[in-house]
Amino acid sequence: MRNPAKQEDLIKAFKALLKEEKFSSQGEIVLALQEEGFENINQSKVSRMLTKFGAVRTRNAKMEMVYCLPAELGVPTTTSPLKNLVLDVDHNDAVVVIHTSPGAAQLIARLLDSLGKSEGILGTIAGDDTIFVTPASSFTARQLYEAILSLFEQEL
């Protein structure tokens, strides 16, 4: 059985490390956590934690790609639903473009990718605050646009 106090300590240490914005790989995070006394931590656990807390890779002040928890994003909660992170949705004849809060694009893209072709999504490309969504062959960009709007309950 998990020790809740130890789990809380791990989460605090994990978040503190990401705030340092100096870890460019999951392996580096594993080593840092092991140095802090979490011997049973491994890359798989770090990967799950990065996903759970919405961590993204971005450039730090030294222009190095590092993992971080964007301040604007934090961890989505019931008081900050994902739809509040979507600022604008637009389309042309080929793709749908979604603008999000800074740092939220990869999280929203992951959600859209999980819906897949049955919802009309062939794939996504996400930056920091912009997502390109390509429709599956059986959907037009307009149909996909309308589906995404309804998903995030936006006005047409």
From Swiss-Prot:
InterPro entries: Arg_repress, Arg_repress_C, Arg_repress_C_sf, Arg_repress_DNA-bd, WH-like_DNA-bd_sf, WH_DNA-bd_sf. Gene3D superfamilies: 3.30.1360.40, Winged helix-like DNA-binding domain superfamily/Winged helix DNA-binding domain. GO terms for molecular function: arginine binding; DNA binding; DNA-binding transcription factor activity. Signal peptide: none annotated. Its main location: cytoplasm. One of its GO terms (cellular component) is cytoplasm. GO terms for biological process: L-arginine biosynthetic process; protein complex oligomerization; regulation of arginine biosynthetic process. Pathway: Amino-acid biosynthesis; L-arginine biosynthesis [regulation]. Keywords: Amino-acid biosynthesis, Arginine biosynthesis, Cytoplasm, DNA-binding, Repressor, Transcription, Transcription regulation. It is found in: Cytoplasm. The keyword DNA-binding applies. Pfam families: Arg_repressor, Arg_repressor_C. Belongs to the ArgR family. Regulates arginine biosynthesis genes. This is Arginine repressor. It comes from Serratia proteamaculans (strain 568). The gene is argR.
